[in-house]
């Protein structure tokens, strides 16, 4: 069973920090995460309410993944740090996390959500496209050549219906 939890206390922050550290280990040679330790040390940082959110996922009670969102501009937010531990992949946890953060972002008043995805993240890109994200021109610098930039409109009626339907089944 998959359970999602918004980061609300020091224990949750410590769990998020552990997942962020695990995520950083998978991207040791990625120039986009060179100053990542500062972000880890300052959690929840830019992902704190009211402009941000950080969600943890548990599979059968075990910490499995996370996702975060923060404000980019009025009405626009950015999804970051979607990560599922390798031992929990293939169970739909990433999809649950993305759909939950989309719903949270819409409830926070954002109308669009953006993200960037490096070339090696093919599975994540397929997930984003299956949910309804579309490619856009670069909106920020990412030092990884071939990075794709995506956006989704959060007040899309079909997306809202999809999220409501999934709420009934999770």
Task: Enumerate the language-model features and the residues they cover.
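C-terminal "cap" of GNAT-fold acetyltransferases
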Residues: 3, 111-114, 118-131, 135-170
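Acetyl-CoA-dependent GNAT
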Residues: 7-80, 85-86, 98-100, 104, ...
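Loop/helix-junction capping segments adjacent to catalytic residues or to phosphate/diphosphate-binding pockets
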Residues: 10-14, 91, 122
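Hydrophobic alpha-helical segments, especially transmembrane helices
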Residues: 81-82, 90, 115, 126
């Amino acid at each position: 069973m998959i359970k999602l939890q918004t980061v609300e206390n020091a224990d949750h922050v410590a769990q998020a920090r552990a997942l962020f550290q695990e995520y950083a280990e998978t991207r040791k040679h990625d120039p986009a995460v060179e100053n990542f330790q500062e972000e880890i040390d300052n959690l929840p940082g830019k992902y704190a309410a009211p402009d941000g959110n950080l969600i943890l996922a548990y599979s059968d009670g075990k910490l499995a993944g996370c996702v975060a969102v923060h404000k980019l501009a009025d009405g626009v937010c950015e999804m970051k740090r979607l990560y599922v531990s390798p031992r929990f992949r293939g169970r739909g946890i990433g999809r649950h996390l993305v759909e939950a953060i989309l719903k949270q972002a819409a409830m926070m008043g954002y109308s669009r959500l953006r993200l960037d995805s490096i070339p090696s993240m093919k599975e994540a890109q397929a997930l984003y496209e299956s949910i309804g994200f579309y490619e856009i021109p670069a909106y920020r610098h990412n030092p990884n050549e071939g990075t794709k930039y995506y956006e989704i409109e959060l007040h899309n009626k079909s997306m809202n219906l999809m999220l409501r339907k999934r709420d009934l089944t999770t």
